[in-house]
């Protein structure tokens, strides 16, 4: 596992475990419409069971637990929200998981900035 970016350099061991290794990590696709409090997050590379390297975004909500995805759309949109918050001197507090259907008819997931 290789950490690409994370919400803070001061994440605890428990937060890093919850974000990256916990068997209780939930899928974004199982939480469509959910409002997440962004207590911590990590973007990292991991290897799947077939040996393929995947980029995974994991968001920790201290109430709901960690929710992760390898969706490029969700990850891109979340990281754009993070960058916009940094540019404005703000911190992202909440995002909503949202879904849509692509032109090809496939379901995709993204996130919406709430506050």
Regions found by a protein language model. Give the residues of each.
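OB-fold ssDNA-binding interfaces and closely related basic DNA-contact patches used
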Residues: 1-64, 104, 113-115
């Amino acid at each position: 596992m290789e950490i690409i970016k994370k919400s803070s350099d001061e994440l605890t061991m428990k937060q890093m475990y919850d974000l990256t290794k916990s068997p209780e990590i939930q899928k974004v696709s199982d939480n469509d419409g959910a409002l997440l409090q962004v207590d911590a997050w990590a973007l990292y590379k991991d290897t799947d069971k077939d040996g393929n390297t995947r980029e995974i975004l994991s968001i920790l909500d201290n109430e709901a637990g960690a929710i992760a995805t390898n969706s490029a759309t969700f990850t891109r949109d979340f990281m754009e929200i993070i960058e916009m918050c940094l540019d404005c001197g703000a911190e992202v507090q909440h995002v909503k998981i949202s879904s849509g259907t692509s032109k090809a008819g496939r379901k995709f997931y993204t996130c919406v900035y709430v506050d």
